[in-house]
């Protein structure tokens, strides 16, 4: 915001202006003050001419010793994936939003990377100079503004940046491409296929997908039959991971109510869908609830709910339909990806308190809270386990998110994927099959 204010051409009190001209037909009668308008010309003059990539890039770029934001593995994954597939946004494409899938996110990431490149090559003060140049009343071209400050056009700076990025990433993925390990792709429609969950009785899985929709967050709930390759939509506008009932006849998920409450608000709540009756039931009301997990032993559903800027774990008793809050995180961290471990009768979940996610475990039996994967320098997330206690999660220790296996029974552990993009959201069946969401050529 400070940088954008610095680039405004007439200060914050005049964000923009219009040159307008209106003309009217001649009056037809003496009692008519004006004739009918026949000309309307309006020419906008923007008070700010900063493209999205530069605005977002400077917002994310950190001055020396600042630690509010950083170039994380997700940003690196998106830029790397575009670079190795010769699909980097052009300089012109970076200047606008309005893209599908992760296109808008790519504008953010490429902008952060290009801004950092400019700061590293030409000094951090060059960013200030570019914003000051864009504040000039007659300067509306970022290409020319960069030329006036750096002595080289914005397009040429971008081409240098592009060559450096492509050379670096293509060199880094050579060892991975020699021995890739990613399994077999079974569903590639859409730009977001998320949270796959094995059917407990059949050879298939439920998942969320944005196929037939425009944007990443517009996801519907589907069931994919691996025997027939039939793909069926169950419900529209579903949010977060679904969870199967152990009998395979019912599935639980989160979505917003169809109609607003008396205050005009629509919140995420937990719903169930019965495949035999094709009936949907709402299990919570205005709970801001998501990520349900069925617990057969207690005939209950654990879920996450948001309040006061953070999340906590709740357990819904299906016999009484009453919810109980079982955690109370006073520092309001971000909680996500709740899963149930039958072998330990506990809940795994991701927790974010600063830059990285860690994996914690909540014991339903004794209500204790334990750290399972907790490293300061890299990210662990998306824990899943089967009845035998085999644990699989996503980890970015190598700089790329890959699936990592840990077997508490014999203390064996190691990576089970080797991908150039990113491996997330694994789910392991009782017979040891692993299904996950792969980011590749997005």
Segments and roles (model prediction):
Residues 66-138, 205, 215-216, 228, ...:
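Ordered, small/hydrophobic-rich secondary-structure cores
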Residues 69-72, 189-191, 209-220, 235-240, ...:
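A flexible loop/linker signature enriched in serine peptidases of the S9 family
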Residues 100-105, 130-249, 272-275:
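Beta/coil-rich, acidic/histidine-enriched accessory regions frequently appended to metallopeptidases
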Residues 181-187, 229-235, 279-284, 322-328, ...:
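A short beta-strand motif characteristic of beta-propeller blades
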Residues 196-204, 242-250, 292-300, 338-346, ...:
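Blade-terminus and WD-like Trp-Asp/Gly-His loop motifs, strongest in beta-propeller folds
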Residues 225-229, 274-278, 317-321, 363-367, ...:
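Short loop/turn segments that connect beta-strands within beta-propeller blades
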């Amino acid at each position: 915001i400070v940088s954008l204010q610095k680039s405004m051409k007439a200060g914050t009190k005049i964000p923009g202006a219009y040159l307008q001209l209106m003309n009217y037909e001649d009056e037809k009668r003496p009692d008519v003050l004006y004739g009918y308008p026949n000309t309307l010309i309006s020419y906008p003059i923007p008070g700010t001419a900063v493209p999205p990539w530069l605005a977002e890039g400077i917002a994310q770029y950190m001055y020396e010793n600042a630690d509010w934001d950083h170039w994380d593995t997700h940003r690196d994954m998106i830029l790397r994936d575009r670079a190795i597939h010769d699909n980097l946004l052009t300089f012109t494409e970076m200047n606008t939003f309005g893209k599908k899938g992760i296109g808008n996110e790519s504008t953010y990431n490429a902008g952060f990377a290009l801004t950092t490149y400019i700061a590293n090559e030409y000094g951090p003060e060059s960013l200030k100079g570019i914003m000051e140049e864009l504040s000039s009343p007659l300067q509306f071209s970022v290409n020319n503004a960069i030329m006036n400050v750096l002595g080289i056009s914005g397009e040429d700076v971008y081409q240098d940046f592009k060559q450096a990025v492509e050379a670096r990433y293509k060199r880094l993925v050579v060892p991975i491409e020699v021995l890739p390990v990613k399994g077999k792709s079974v569903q590639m429609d859409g730009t977001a296929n998320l949270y796959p969950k094995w059917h407990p009785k059949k050879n298939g899985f439920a998942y969320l997908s944005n196929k037939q929709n425009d944007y990443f967050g517009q996801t519907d709930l589907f069931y994919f039959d691996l025997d027939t390759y039939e793909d069926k939509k169950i419900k529209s506008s579903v949010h977060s991971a679904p969870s199967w009932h152990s009998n395979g006849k019912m599935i639980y998920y989160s979505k917003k109510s169809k109609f607003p409450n008396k205050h005009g608000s629509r919140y995420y709540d937990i719903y169930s869908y019965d495949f035999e009756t094709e009936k949907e039931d709402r299990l919570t009301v205005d709970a801001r609830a998501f990520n349900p997990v069925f617990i057969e032993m207690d005939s209950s559903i654990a879920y996450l709910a948001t309040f006061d800027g953070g999340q906590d774990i709740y357990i819904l008793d299906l016999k009484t339909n009453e919810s109980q809050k079982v955690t109370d995180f006073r520092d309001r961290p971000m909680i996500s990806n709740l899963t149930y471990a039958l072998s330990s009768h506990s809940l795994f979940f991701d927790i974010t308190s600063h830059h990285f996610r860690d994996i914690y475990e909540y014991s339903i039996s004794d209500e204790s809270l334990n750290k399972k994967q907790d490293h300061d320098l890299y990210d662990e997330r998306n824990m899943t386990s089967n009845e035998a206690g085999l644990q699989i999660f996503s980890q970015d220790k190598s700089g790329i998110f890959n699936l990592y296996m840990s077997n508490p029974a014999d203390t064996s552990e190691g990576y089970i994927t080797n991908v150039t993009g990113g491996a997330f959201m694994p789910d392991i069946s009782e017979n040891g099959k692993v299904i996950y969401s792969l980011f590749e050529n997005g």
